[in-house]
Each structure stands twice: as structure tokens, then as C-alpha cells.
Swiss-Prot record:
Highest taxon of source: Bacteria
Protein purpose: Has a glutathione-disulfide oxidoreductase activity in the presence of NADPH and glutathione reductase. Reduces low molecular weight disulfides and proteins.
Protein family per UniProt: Belongs to the glutaredoxin family.
Intracellular or extracellular location(s): Cytoplasm
Record bears the keyword Electron transport: yes
Designated name of the protein: Glutaredoxin 1
Upper classification of the organism: Bacteria, Pseudomonadati, Pseudomonadota, Alphaproteobacteria, Rickettsiales
GO BP terms in the entry: cell redox homeostasis; cellular response to oxidative stress
Binding partners and assembly: Monomer.
Species of the source: Rickettsia typhi (strain ATCC VR-144 / Wilmington)
């Protein structure tokens, strides 16, 4: 199977956040590749950029699919409940590998 990434999924998290764990579990259940960015070590500049990118939200998780801000955990589960998450992910390669990136 070709493992080229057709969608970019990024989830900003904190290790101890139960909502982050829940959101990642749903993405894992969907068997998709995502990039996890741990925000605990962000510099002030990185925090400000994260908040701006998240539409003023400073909570985690914040989830992006192809640079589109999906929102937080509840938003992700609402997409799932409405049947829209699968449509967003349908061409995403099936692979449980995830990548964890820490702030600078």
C-alpha cells in the first residue's frame, strides 16, 4: 500500500489531558496517521502562534485536518456522530503510526 500522506492531521496536546487522550483514541480507532504536537514546552511566541491558529482558543486538544481547524475533542466527536469525520478522512492512509513532536 502506498503510504503517501493525502491529508495532514495535526493534534495539539498535553500528555496529561484526558480530552487529548480521548481525541487521539478516536483517531487511532480510525486508523489514520496524525502528527501530535505537545504544547507544554512551547515558548511564548509558539503559544501565541498556536492560539492565533486555533481561532483564539488556548485549550487542548486542538485538531486540524489539511490546515482546517476542526476544533477540540467535543468537535471531533460531533463530526464522528454526524458521520462527517469519515468523509474528511476517507482518503487518509490506513496506518496506526503517529508522530509526536515536542515544542522547542
Amino acid at each position: 500500500m502506498n503510504k503517501s500522506i493525502l491529508h495532514t492531521i495535526i493534534i495539539y496536546t498535553l500528555a496529561s489531558c484526558p480530552y487529548c487522550i480521548k481525541a487521539k483514541a478516536l483517531l487511532d480507532k480510525k486508523n489514520v496517521i496524525y502528527e501530535e504536537i505537545e504544547v507544554s514546552n512551547f515558548t511564548q511566541e509558539e503559544k501565541e502562534a498556536f492560539i492565533k491558529k486555533s481561532g483564539g482558543k488556548n485549550t487542548v486538544p486542538q485538531i486540524f485536518i489539511d490546515n482546517m481547524h476542526v476544533g477540540g475533542c467535543d468537535d471531533l466527536f460531533n463530526l464522528e456522530q454526524d458521520g462527517r469525520l469519515d468523509k474528511l478522512l476517507e482518503t487518509q492512509p490506513k496506518n496506526k503510526n503517529s508522530l509526536t513532536v515536542s515544542g522547542a
